[in-house]
């Protein structure tokens, strides 16, 4: 085999051919670029914006179609088990809200995990991590409001049983005299002509309110004493007969009517009559409807 001989002239000719080919390719590219730029110059801005909007709508529709495509159950379970970080979405976009399907899936999962509501008769539960207090709260022993206060009165403590109201009334009956004295003194202050000049309207109203509260307190205590006395007398006469609350109410009303003055009795009867008429009118209106 003879080795091929290349002359200097043949090599130069090849280089010239190669350079001419390159020049032609570059010239063609420049021509095509000029034509493209000329076409873009002729297109209006409105048509460009329309084309852009159309492309965006097409992209959205394609994304929706991709979402609507049902995946097999195995893939679904794998996706549910694997949760991507909160900053990156399924499409790889940053800081986007999760899709509605993902939210519905998570809400269903949470609803399944939620425990059922316990019965009110179930035993009370407490955390094992929380330390048990040395002073235990026993229901019925501690007062609701008095337990947190600084000072406690032993006489009214529930730990020593229920308070005997009759015994307390007998022990503190002397307070009625003080109450009546206070009412008379306050009435004198109001009747005085100098009170309007010396006292403000607010102070006068507070005195009136105090008189009213003291009077109502005295009246309630007197009514309670009367009820207890009537029940005591009835039990003394009828030992083997149990007194019902309705019978007790009737006996108390009768005793009150007997102790009333005729003018007071008329007022009470008139008030009851008006109340009864109001009830009847309400009943008529209800029946008409």
From Swiss-Prot:
InterPro entries, per the entry: RRP36
Signal peptide: none
Superkingdom field: Eukaryota
Ranges of compositional bias, category Low complexity: 140-149
Ranges of Basic residues composition bias in the record: 63-75
Residue ranges, annotated region (Disordered): 27-149, 253-272
Keyword set includes Cell inner membrane: no
Biased composition, class Basic and acidic residues, residue ranges: 99-117, 253-269
Coiled coil: 162-224
Keyword terms, alphabetized: Coiled coil, Nucleus, Ribonucleoprotein, Ribosome biogenesis, rRNA processing
Record carries keyword Ribonucleoprotein: yes
Subunit-structure text: Associates with 90S and pre-40S pre-ribosomal particles.
Purpose: Component of the 90S pre-ribosome involved in the maturation of rRNAs. Required for early cleavages of the pre-RNAs in the 40S ribosomal subunit maturation pathway.
PANTHER family cross-referenced by the UniProt entry: RIBOSOMAL RNA PROCESSING PROTEIN 36 HOMOLOG
Family: Belongs to the RRP36 family.
Name the UniProt record assigns to this protein: rRNA biogenesis protein RRP36
Organism: Komagataella phaffii (strain GS115 / ATCC 20864) (Yeast)
């Amino acid at each position: 085999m003879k080795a091929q001989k290349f002359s200097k002239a043949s090599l130069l000719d090849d280089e010239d051919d190669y350079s001419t080919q390159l020049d032609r390719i570059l010239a063609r590219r420049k021509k095509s670029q000029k034509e493209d730029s000329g076409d873009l110059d002729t297109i209006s801005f409105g048509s460009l914006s329309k084309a852009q909007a159309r492309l965006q709508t097409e992209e959205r529709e394609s994304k929706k179609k991709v979402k609507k495509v049902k995946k097999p159950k195995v893939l679904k379970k794998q996706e549910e088990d694997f949760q991507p970080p909160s900053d990156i979405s399924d499409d790889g976009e940053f800081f986007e809200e999760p899709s509605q399907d993902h939210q519905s899936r998570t809400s269903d999962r949470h609803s399944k995990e939620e425990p059922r509501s316990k019965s009110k008769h179930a035993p009370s539960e407490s955390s094992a991590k929380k330390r048990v207090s040395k002073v235990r709260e026993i229901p019925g022993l501690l007062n609701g409001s008095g337990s947190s206060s600084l000072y406690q009165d032993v006489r009214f403590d529930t730990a020593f049983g229920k308070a005997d109201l009759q015994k307390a009334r007998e022990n503190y009956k002397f307070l009625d005299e003080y109450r009546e004295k206070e009412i008379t003194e306050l009435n004198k202050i109001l009747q005085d002509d100098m009170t309007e000049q010396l006292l403000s309207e607010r102070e006068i109203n507070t005195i009136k309110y105090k008189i009213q509260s003291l009077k109502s307190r005295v009246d309630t205590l007197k009514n309670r004493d009367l009820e207890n006395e009537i029940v005591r007398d009835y039990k003394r006469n009828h030992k083997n007969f149990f007194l019902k609350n309705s019978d007790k109410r009737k006996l108390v009303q009768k005793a009150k009517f007997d102790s009333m003055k005729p003018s007071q009795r008329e007022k009470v009867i008139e008030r009851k009559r008006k109340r009864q008429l109001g009830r009847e009118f309400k009943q008529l209106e209800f029946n008409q409807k």
